């Protein structure tokens, strides 16, 4: 039997091994772990609280976790909870019954969502653009699914066949095959949609409801009620289509609300948590009408329904409380604190002011907050039409060290945000009296000390620092050498980049005259180069989408500067360095997890492996292949690579990653690689594999990659843990 027929006869057995048991789940910051027991993530306390929930809230325990915990998932099979620590690139594994810590799993950069299936834990890595898949029994990393930018919220269908993820900035959702760990399609909610964090799926799993904010970046007259709009978008999951004409405008069916982030569907009622306006819009999805408007605590981000379905519980993240909503009356009947946020009163008040639109001093009609454009103190990575021209949104993290502020450098103190609060957000302001920005903010009297509330807001912005861990990248010898070459170019006399971008902040905090893309000139303050990889688009007006584009024009667009000649790999080397610039320690938060010991593993339910092939013909040598493969396994496994030529029924196999040998079907063959123990995702590269001896140029070859349990025969498809196939013409 040819290998192709063997594959068709037995491939379904591999899919059955994934198991389809548990009910559908979605990411949340609060989950039930029993009939009355629940755990909630305390984002600003860096902890998790254990609760007894009924018609009131009783806190029974609390345990510290890593920096900036975000969501929690319950593993009923093992009585554990998984908590993502976004600020430390890790997941804490805790007991679900009492405050006990079992260990920590390291992840890629900025994990946000976590969801547990029958066998796996799925974790979204927001800054690495990956969905990581772990065996939930022995914690081995089984797969990494490459997706578009900033994956965040996760939802798993009840049959565990499909996984959906939101993309926070771009207003997209991706559909993923949760058995083969492959992306199927990415669906856009429109190029203005963003801040997409949650997906709720109806009971028939035909439609998805995604809260989001439409950002009107085309507006040339920015006002509080023309810049952003709160919506719920609807996606037809069967046809993978955004139903644009059916989307729900929350400001029309409800009163104006701010920053709809999370949601939960209960029957026909969709509970939409409007984080900035501190309320819930309950929408009847059949009638497209408002069922109720519920006021809750500060910045609600998570909601869960109790097992008896009598109550819903809301995580109010900024005031560290949980609200109880009676399902029959849709009324908040209780709200209790579940943590004491370990910050001084002034900073806590600053956090509240920064995130709220439910304060007439900060916003008009609950429409917009500082966090709408600067979520978590960062940037929305958009370009807006301000009176002085197109301006990309800068991050506020560590900004207190890089004044003056704004691209034009026209704010000489953080307290001058009073002008933005009044002019853009429509608030009455935090100061009694003028904003002291006439004729300009930097020429008027100081605002510091004029308002306790404004001082508190400025204190919070000043406290913003980078996470404890940098964005992790694969550091090979080649990439390290490229960074070193780029660093030498950056500091060289010829290029003199460091003249304006000196370490450790990589800015001179000075204004320079820049030639504008539309003609004319403008005075622009030198931006810091810290975290440059995550701050696209580049320049004050966002004219450059990539650093490669920027380096093609810069610094010749600075008055008095001439263009430098970057040849060969110099641009790539300089970009490699720019994207790897280290943040100074005083601008980074300290890690909280002093021990990152992995939890004690259990034997997995059954052997699972994954293997993925990449084949590239060397352009300079048509008979030379660049072969790479990525594989993993939760137990000991072998990986075979077999080459098939259908026209002649000839077969070859690879031995030890380099040697290729011809064989007849049925003969003993050696694995390409052997793993005596479980092994997480790792990559092998076999450059310049010469196939001249095959003498079959122009023919099509089929490459079969097969993973089996250690020592098992690759001829029996029942032994296959995974299979991948690629065709290539030499």
Report each predicted region and the residues it spans.
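Beta-strand-rich domains and repeat architectures in extracellular enzymes and scaffolds
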Residues: 23-46, 258-261
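Residue-level detector of Asp-centered blade-edge/turn motifs that repeat once per structural unit
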Residues: 32-35, 75-78, 116-118, 158-159, ...
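Short loop/turn segments that connect beta-strands within beta-propeller blades
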Residues: 52-56, 95-99, 135-139, 177-181, ...
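A short beta-strand motif characteristic of beta-propeller blades
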Residues: 58-63, 100-105, 140-145, 182-188, ...
């Amino acid at each position: 039997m040819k290998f192709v027929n063997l594959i068709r006869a037995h491939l379904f057995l591999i899919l059955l091994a994934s198991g389809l048991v548990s009910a559908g789940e979605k990411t949340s910051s609060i989950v039930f772990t029993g009939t009355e027991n629940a755990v909630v993530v305390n984002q600003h306390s860096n902890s998790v609280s254990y609760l007894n929930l009924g018609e009131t809230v009783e806190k029974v325990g609390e345990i510290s976790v890593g920096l900036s915990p975000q969501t929690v998932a319950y593993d009923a099979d093992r009585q554990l909870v998984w908590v993502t620590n976004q600020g430390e690139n890790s997941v804490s594994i805790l007991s679900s019954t009492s405050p006990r810590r079992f260990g920590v799993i390291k992840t890629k950069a900025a994990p946000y969502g976590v969801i547990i299936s029958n066998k796996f834990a799925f974790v979204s890595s927001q800054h690495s653009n990956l969905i990581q898949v772990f065996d939930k029994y022995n914690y081995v990393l089984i797969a990494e699914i490459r997706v578009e930018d900033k994956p965040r919220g996760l939802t798993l269908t009840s049959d565990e066949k499909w996984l959906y993820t939101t993309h926070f900035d771009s207003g997209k959702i991706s559909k993923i095959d949760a058995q083969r760990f492959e992306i199927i399609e990415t669906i856009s909610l429109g190029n203005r949609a963003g801040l997409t964090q949650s997906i709720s799926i109806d009971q028939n799993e035909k439609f998805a409801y995604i809260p989001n904010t439409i950002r009107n970046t085309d507006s040339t007259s920015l006002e509080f009620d023309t810049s952003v709009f709160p919506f719920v978008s609807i996606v037809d999951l069967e046809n993978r289509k955004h139903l644009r004409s059916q989307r729900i405008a929350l400001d029309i069916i409800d009163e104006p609300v701010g920053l709809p982030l999370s949601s939960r569907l209960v029957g026909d009622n969709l509970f939409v948590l409007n984080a900035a306006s501190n309320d819930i819009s309950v929408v009847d999805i059949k009638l497209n009408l408002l069922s109720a408007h519920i006021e809750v605590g500060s910045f609600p981000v998570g909601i869960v329904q109790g097992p008896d379905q009598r109550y819903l519980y809301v995580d109010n993240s900024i005031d560290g409380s949980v609200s109880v909503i009676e399902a029959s009356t849709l009324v908040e009947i209780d709200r209790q604190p579940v943590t004491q946020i370990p910050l001084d009163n002034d900073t806590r008040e600053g956090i509240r002011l920064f995130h709220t639109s439910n304060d007439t001093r900060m916003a008009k009609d609950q429409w917009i907050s500082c966090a709408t454009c600067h979520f978590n103190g960062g940037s929305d990575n958009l370009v807006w039409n301000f009176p002085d021209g197109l301006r990309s949104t800068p991050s506020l993290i560590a900004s207190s060290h890089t004044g003056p502020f704004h691209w034009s450098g026209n704010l000489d103190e953080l307290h001058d945000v009073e002008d933005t609060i009044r002019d853009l957000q429509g608030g009455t302001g935090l100061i009694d009296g003028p904003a002291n920005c006439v004729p300009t903010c930097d020429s008027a009297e100081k605002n510091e000390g004029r308002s306790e509330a404004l001082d508190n807001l400025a204190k919070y912005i000043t406290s913003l620092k980078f996470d404890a861990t940098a964005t992790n990248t694969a550091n090979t010898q080649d990439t390290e050498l490229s960074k070193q070459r780029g660093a030498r170019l950056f500091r060289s006399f010829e290029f003199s980049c460091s003249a304006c971008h000196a370490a450790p902040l990589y800015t001179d905090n000075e204004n320079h005259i820049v030639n504008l893309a539309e003609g004319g000139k403008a005075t622009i303050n030198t931006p810091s180069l810290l975290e440059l990889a995550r701050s696209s688009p580049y320049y004050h007006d966002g004219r450059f989408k990539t650093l490669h584009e920027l380096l093609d024009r810069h610094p010749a667009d600075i008055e008095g500067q001439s263009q430098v000649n970057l040849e060969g790999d110099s641009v790539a080397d300089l970009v490699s360095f720019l994207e790897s610039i280290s943040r100074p320690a005083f601008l980074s938060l300290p890690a909280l997890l002093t021990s990152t010991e992995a939890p004690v593993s259990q034997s997995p339910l059954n052997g699972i492996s994954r293997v993925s092939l990449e084949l590239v013909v060397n352009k300079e040598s048509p008979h030379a292949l660049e072969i790479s493969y990525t594989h993993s396994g939760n137990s000991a496994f072998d990986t075979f690579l077999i080459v098939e030529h259908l026209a002649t029924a000839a077969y070859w196999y690879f031995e030890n990653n380099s040697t290729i040998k011809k064989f007849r079907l049925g003969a003993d063959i050696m694995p390409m690689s052997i793993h005596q123990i479980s092994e997480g995702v790792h990559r092998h590269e076999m450059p310049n594999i010469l196939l001249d001896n095959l003498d079959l140029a122009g023919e099509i070859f089929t490459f079969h990659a097969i993973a089996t349990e250690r020592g098992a025969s690759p001829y029996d498809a029942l032994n296959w843990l995974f299979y991948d196939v690629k065709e290539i013409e030499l």
